[in-house]
């Protein structure tokens, strides 16, 4: 297999060569974030902040679907990369195929269960009489498109592991551009509201999904689908290795509910709209960390699978330098650019604007710590140690965050809500540093 990220020796490891993988991976993450943000801008501009709040309320459902996709995509791709590094093609194909089939089947079952109880679930998530109609419209589209949503995410990761990060980026870019164009037509020109926004998003995902299928039929370098010797055990192995991503998405779903309900009690529906804006902007900044970490992860897996520990350590030295500098730059950008960024979603005279600006500046303190936490989790997953990855993610995204969301608002009010994330990330960092010790065979 010709793959730019399989290094024969420590001397071959160069940052410029590594960038061939990191840059497309980061751009994929960045562009996914950008077109999600543009989605929000179209909705808030042409439909209103209540519609934006409706989408935010539905996000826990989207997070469940995304979580199912990511648990198999990240876990399965890491296991597959370990097999590729060890030159074990049959096992790599089996891991890839088992992950894909299991993820899509599970996603369809979960979507069906949610659809049959949609009204009750949306009420639990915080839908009000003002937002319930928009919530139902947006949620139904996502649930009905579950196979495409999950398949697109799977292909993004496995195409990258197959040694084609640029093609993976092109699939995301193509779907995103179609989404933006359709947002302009359906939401901006045809005034189709949330229905149009949902349709635009799903059609963009369909394009990316179709390009993924085309790749594995006509352009694959190493991996291929197989029905031979597929086993539940292999699917479970991949799922457990990627458990941290499901924990992350499930945690986002739960904490979004708590965020919405807590902010609702302090600032009403304007506060919920502000949370939506903060979440959009968070994706933009935190995407840098995910892009770098996921970009370097396959190289770590290839080297570890081939027992080339010195290569792993050299790769990690680049990561240490990156995370010594990037968090400071990202927080500085967050602090100074927040007013401009928020004005893309809400008018400066809107009551939503000051809530979002002040909230983002406090919330953004978490970016000083989250990069190392994210890398530590993805690093352990790349080495096939998903249980440690899951622990880091569980702490930062769920346990500590939920604890601080309950405790800090009692003392600091609305500011306490925004402080919960930095507090959770800072405490998790103490654990993450321990997991960044040198790896051994």
Regions of interest found by a model, annotated:
Residues 34-53, 122-129, 185-192, 253-284, ...:
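Helix-terminus/linker motif at the lipid-water interface of multi-pass membrane proteins
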Residues 20-39, 141, 175, 204-208, ...:
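Transmembrane helical elements of multi-pass membrane transporters/channels
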Residues 10-47, 60-75, 79, 83, ...:
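N-terminal transmembrane alpha-helices
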Residues 1-22, 80-147, 189-243, 300-366, ...:
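Short alpha-helical transmembrane segments in multi-pass integral membrane proteins
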Residues 73, 142-160, 168-176, 197-210, ...:
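Short runs within selected transmembrane alpha-helices of multi-pass transporters and secretion channels
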Residues 25, 29, 41, 78, ...:
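Transmembrane alpha-helix boundary and packing residues in multipass membrane permease domains
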């Amino acid at each position: 297999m010709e793959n730019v990220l399989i290094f024969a020796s420590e001397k071959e490891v160069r940052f410029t060569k590594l960038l061939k993988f990191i840059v497309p991976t980061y751009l994929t993450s960045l562009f996914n974030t950008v077109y999600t943000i543009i989605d929000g801008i179209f909705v808030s501009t042409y439909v209103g902040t209540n519609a934006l709040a409706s989408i935010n309320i539905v996000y826990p459902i989207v997070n469940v679907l995304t979580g199912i996709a990511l648990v198999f995509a990240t876990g399965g791709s890491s296991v597959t990369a370990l097999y590729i590094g060890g030159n074990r093609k049959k096992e790599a194909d089996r891991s890839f195929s088992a992950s894909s089939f299991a993820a899509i089947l599970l996603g369809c079952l979960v979507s069906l269960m949610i659809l049959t109880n949609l009204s009750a679930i949306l009420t639990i998530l915080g839908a009000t009489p003002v937002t319930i109609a928009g919530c139902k419209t947006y949620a139904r589209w996502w649930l009905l498109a579950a196979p495409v949503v999950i398949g697109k995410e799977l292909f993004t990761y496995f195409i990258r592991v197959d040694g084609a990060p640029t093609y993976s980026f092109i699939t995301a870019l193509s779907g995103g551009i179609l989404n933006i164009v359709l947002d302009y037509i359906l939401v901006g020109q045809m005034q189709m509201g949330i229905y149009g926004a949902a349709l635009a998003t799903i059609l963009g995902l369909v394009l990316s999904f179709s390009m993924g299928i085309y790749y594995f039929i006509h352009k694959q370098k190493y991996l291929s689908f197989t029905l031979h010797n597929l086993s539940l055990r292999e699917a479970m192995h991949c799922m457990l290795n990627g458990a941290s991503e499901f924990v992350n998405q499930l945690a986002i779903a739960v904490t979004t509910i708590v965020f919405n309900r807590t902010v609702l009690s302090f600032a009403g529906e304007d506060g919920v709209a502000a949370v939506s804006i903060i979440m959009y902007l968070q994706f933009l900044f935190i995407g840098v960390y995910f892009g770098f970490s996921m970009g370097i992860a396959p190289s770590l897996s290839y080297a570890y699978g081939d027992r080339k520990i010195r290569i792993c350590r050299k790769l990690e030295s680049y990561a240490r330098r990156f995370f010594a500098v990037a968090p400071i730059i990202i927080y500085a950008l967050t602090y100074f650019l927040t007013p401009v960024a928020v004005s893309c979603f809400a008018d400066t005279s809107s009551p939503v604007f000051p809530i979002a600006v002040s909230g983002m500046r406090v919330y953004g303190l978490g970016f000083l710590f989250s990069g190392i936490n994210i890398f530590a989790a993805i690093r352990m997953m790349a080495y096939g140690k998903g249980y440690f990855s899951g622990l880091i993610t569980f702490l930062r995204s769920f346990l500590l965050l939920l604890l601080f969301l309950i405790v800090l608002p009692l003392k600091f009010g609305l500011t306490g809500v925004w402080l919960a994330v930095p507090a959770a990330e800072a405490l998790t960092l103490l654990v993450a540093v321990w997991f960044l010790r040198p790896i051994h065979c």
